[in-house]
């Protein structure tokens, strides 16, 4: 079986993965994910119709966001679970369709007669994987013949995946926004239109930027209202000789529950990858057994998890194929999945997840090896940065800071990403890097020093904390009484890998930022015509 996937930066030859995903995704998993997205579009068709009659179902809307999140790179490689999501998607679609038709018939005293797209009515006969795979071949990426329409439809879906991920994270912390969910469904439903134009699709793609900002703001509010505003924090990168759990991914609530359940058990907990910023939240750093951060970005995990020696928990995306050396001590939870890896089930209403299997494994393994480390400085989210804004402004006015470089985004395996390390090393000592996301691991261990106590690497947090970088830029614009954000002494050198980074890019464009340098390559899902339009309109370049 073949596949066609070009949603990430590492897609084969910067064209598409067709035999096997560079990420490790099988053709079967890729095709099942295509079908899941197809059914999500069908749900969205009915949800939009229902919303026109003031009929809503939050469980359906949230499922659409969750379903998109499942298809993000490195989230779920478990075919069986993708099949379960498709089963549930068909059920959710039926629920919202019936709700709509019931109200429609009462209001108009007649049955709904409009022509309905196949995604909204396709019903499997056998509900098995073979049937799903056969259907997936019909509805995958290449089912759209027009190159530019295909490019824009996929650009749209890829951007929506990031919005969906941030929205889902916020919902886990009891924060939701109906307008964001409604936009996701409206945009998905629009991709089913046979008469949609290039201009209409381009406008929808750019609209993602607005909702990307809204979703990041929602998640920021969820995180900070739950765990407090991040504080400037020194994080240790070594390990201690005790039983240990390493927590990777993005889900702060999972980390909190692990910390709660390991209190008094002699276990030290470490963050990994995108979980590093958790060490700066008051509600998490208060736990004395949160010992620091081990390792770097996601793509080094196979060696790092093997070396770590303790139990490992993957809370969101960024999982790679586990090596046999640690497969019996790695656990997934939430939307993450890998075949034959033990999964921690979701929490029941108002309860916690039960991380007992992880804790037992850590205790069974016993103490891990002691390693010396160094301290790195984190915690410069927008609230903390605002508290030192006067100092930053004064340093700019005095000429001690001459330029800021926003170097947020994702890290990855591509050797060309060494460019970002060299770029950081070669910056003048009067330059300051503003970063968020795992791209930071290319330079956050360098000894770049500080300027009057201001670190030359200002780390705002996870990829969603790019929102903090935007707020910081807007505050600087206000402080210098400028009319345009592009008048600031800021350059944008963004590294992308997966779909959330595309959402961040569109959010920056929405905020009016121009002249972004995007790398290490430009997205394969952009056709030549679409790429030319976007590059010319927003002055986007590559490295």
From Swiss-Prot:
Tell me the classification of the organism that encodes this protein: Bacteria, Thermotogati, Thermotogota, Thermotogae, Petrotogales
Main function: Catalyzes the reduction of hydroxylamine to form NH(3) and H(2)O.
Required cofactors, per record?
[4Fe-4S] cluster; hybrid [4Fe-2O-2S] cluster
Principal subcellular localisation of the protein = cytoplasm
Q: Please give one Pfam family short name.
A: Prismane
Q: Name one GO molecular function term.
A: hydroxylamine reductase activity
- The protein's enzyme class: oxidoreductase
Keyword Plastid (UniProt): no
Any single biological process term in GO: response to hydrogen peroxide
Which protein family is named in the record? Belongs to the HCP family.
Task: Name the gene for this chain.
Answer: hcp
EC number(s) per UniProt?
1.7.99.1
Q: Which UniProt keywords apply?
A: 4Fe-4S, Cytoplasm, Iron, Iron-sulfur, Metal-binding, Oxidoreductase
Q: Name one GO cellular component term.
A: cytoplasm
Which positions does UniProt annotate for [4Fe-4S] cluster binding? 5, 8, 17, 23
Task: Give all Cysteine persulfide modified positions.
Answer: 410
**Species name:** Petrotoga mobilis (strain DSM 10674 / SJ95)
Q: Does the keyword Oxidoreductase apply?
A: yes
Q: Where does hybrid [4Fe-2O-2S] cluster bind?
A: 250, 274, 318, 410, 438, 463, 498, 500
> Which named protein is this?
Hydroxylamine reductase
What reaction does this enzyme carry out catalytically? A + NH4(+) + H2O = hydroxylamine + AH2 + H(+)
Q: What detail does the entry give on cofactor binding? A: Binds 1 [4Fe-4S] cluster. Binds 1 hybrid [4Fe-2O-2S] cluster.
User: Where's it found, cell-wise?
Assistant: Cytoplasm
Top-level taxonomic group: Bacteria
